[in-house]
């Protein structure tokens, strides 16, 4: 059957993810490594320049300046966060239930507190030593004024003019790592509220159907993921060759106070003609990922503040997160197929994609069977 089919898996695979485009990966630590390299190179260059000129005073001044500025930056950040406390006090009862400890913990939590404490301690010791050993050089009013400016004025000015605001890249990276994107919430909701309930029961529902149990060869749920996020109410509207032919027996589950809530899957038939006049029928359990329509509606609703470009980004994150969640779910393993595609009804036909996946799977099975045949 695979040799007769008009489509092979690699025909569609040539278009990355069926015209959807590349799926981005989580950001790594390249920015952190680059910053560390800049610090090392800059420090080494300055140290070599001072050493080359045999400037002992220069080395002392370099050590003093590094400790001086580092400590002032740390103290300046603490002062800035004290200013944040002034706002949180107004919300102490509504947000923190009147707990002062929670207010301070939320405001003064640092990601790398051990590292910050270590740097601040070393800087303090270095600064104290320099002031004690070379007090006639460094114990001056102008240095004290500069220290206070760095602690009290510069951090507040940078905050007021917006220099402390995270860039879109940093915001995106933070949201991705902490599951704070809209897409992350939708993916988790889709899994816990639907897929985790129906996928473990899918094989049983297929076997209960006298009509479909022998017609459905791909015993999994095919989940359509259009990049446009637009989902048709009827898949036949997107591709007339994908025709609904019935439903599997429904699963009835008590959920959220609803007794025997009904979950059921639609079965679609695709008829593919061959040049010799014959035709092949395929049956798939296929449906759209319904949360994508929420993203589509949000991008059209002004108050949701989700632009078209941001929606395109969120759908990629949704697919990535859903892939990650399902990949770790033993109860859903082998019972689903995620299908990202462009959503362009003219360029990437749903029927062609499904049949190509089916035929490609058959080719892989045939190849595995040939490999497993023992040689005489």
Swiss-Prot record:
Keywords: Immunity, Innate immunity, Membrane, Transmembrane, Transmembrane helix. GO terms for cellular component: autophagosome; endoplasmic reticulum membrane. 2',3'-cUAMP binds at residues 194, 255, 259, 261, 290. GO terms for biological process: activation of innate immune response; autophagosome assembly; innate immune response; positive regulation of macroautophagy; positive regulation of type I interferon production; reticulophagy. Facilitator of innate immune signaling that acts as a sensor of second messenger signals produced by cyclic GMP-AMP synthase-like receptors (cGLRs) and promotes the production of type I interferon. Innate immune response is triggered in response to nucleotides from viruses and bacteria delivered to the cytoplasm. Acts by binding cyclic dinucleotides: recognizes and binds cyclic UMP-AMP (2',3'-cUAMP) and 2'-3' linked cGAMP (2'-3'-cGAMP), two second messengers produced by cGLRs in response to nucleotides in the cytosol, such as double-stranded RNA (dsRNA). Belongs to the STING family. This is Stimulator of interferon genes protein 1. It comes from Stylophora pistillata. The gene is STING1.
């Amino acid at each position: 059957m695979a040799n007769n089919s008009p489509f092979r898996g690699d025909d569609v695979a040539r278009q990355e993810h069926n015209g959807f485009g590349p799926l981005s990966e989580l950001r790594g630590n390249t920015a952190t490594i680059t910053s560390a390299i800049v610090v090392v190179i800059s420090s080494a260059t300055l140290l070599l320049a001072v050493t080359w000129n045999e400037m002992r005073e220069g080395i002392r001044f370099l050590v003093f300046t590094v400790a001086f500025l580092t400590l002032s930056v740390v103290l300046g950040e603490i002062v800035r966060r004290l200013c944040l406390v002034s706002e949180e006090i107004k919300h102490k009862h509504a947000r923190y239930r009147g707990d002062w400890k929670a207010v301070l913990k939320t405001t003064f939590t640092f990601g790398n507190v051990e590292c910050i404490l270590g740097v601040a301690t070393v800087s303090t010791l270095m600064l104290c030593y320099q002031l004690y050993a070379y007090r006639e050089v460094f114990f001056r009013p102008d240095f004290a004024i500069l220290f206070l400016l760095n602690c009290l004025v510069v951090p507040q000015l940078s905050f007021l003019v917006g220099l402390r605001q995270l860039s879109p890249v940093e915001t995106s990276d933070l949201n991705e790592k902490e599951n704070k994107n809209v897409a992350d919430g939708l993916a988790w909701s889709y899994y816990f509220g639907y897929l985790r309930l129906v996928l473990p029961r899918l094989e049983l529902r297929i076997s209960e159907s006298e009509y479909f149990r022998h017609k459905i060869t791909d015993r999994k749920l095919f989940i359509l993921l259009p990049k446009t996020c637009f989902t048709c109410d009827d898949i036949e509207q997107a591709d007339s060759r994908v025709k609904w032919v019935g439903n599997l027996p429904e699963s009835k589950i008590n959920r959220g106070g609803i007794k025997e809530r009904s979950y059921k899957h639609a079965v679609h038939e695709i008829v593919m003609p061959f040049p010799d006049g014959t035709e092949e029928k395929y049956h798939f359990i296929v449906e759209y990922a319904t949360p994508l329509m929420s993203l589509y509606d949000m991008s059209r609703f002004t108050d949701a503040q989700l632009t078209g470009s941001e929606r395109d980004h969120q759908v990629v994150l949704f697919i990535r997160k859903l892939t990650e969640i399902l990949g770790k779910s033993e109860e859903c393993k082998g019972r689903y197929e995620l299908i990202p595609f462009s959503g362009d009804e003219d360029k990437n036909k749903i029927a062609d994609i499904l049949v190509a996946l089916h035929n490609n799977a058959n080719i892989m099975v045939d190849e595995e069977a040939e490999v497993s045949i023992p040689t005489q």
